[in-house]
Amino acid sequence: MSPKIRQTIYLLGTAAPALLGIVLIWGGLDAESAADLGDIIAGVVSILVSGAPAVAAGTVRSQRKDGTLSTSPVDQVTKGVEQVLAARQSAEAEVAKVKQALETAVSGSLPQLGPLATQILNVADDTVWRP
């Protein structure tokens, strides 16, 4: 998750409880329902709790400005090379599986060939005489 997305989530986490707290306080302080202190207390607590995401959002903002959350070009290249090497190893493993499957399939389908035919199939192209 990028620092900008985290900062946005923290800011939304700050605004939602604060707005809910204000609504609860206004609803609790209504003339008809002034006796309902539970809503008032819940509203005040909700406003106080909204301070934690505000602090987190401020921290992320300052970290983004001073470069704490950004990765260095060396780290980015190193991570990219590691990913390429991992992909290469995975591809080599898959190729080995395919070769093994082909060898199994070919050796299983050509048992009727004699030793001379097998030698002919195994000879390199440059060693065969051509007129």
From Swiss-Prot:
Main location: host cell
One Pfam family here: Phage_holin_7_1
Coiled coil among keywords: yes
Gene Ontology CC, one term: host cell plasma membrane
Keyword Lipoprotein: no
Transmembrane segments: 9-29, 40-60
Protein name in the entry: Holin
Encoding gene, per UniProt annotation: 11
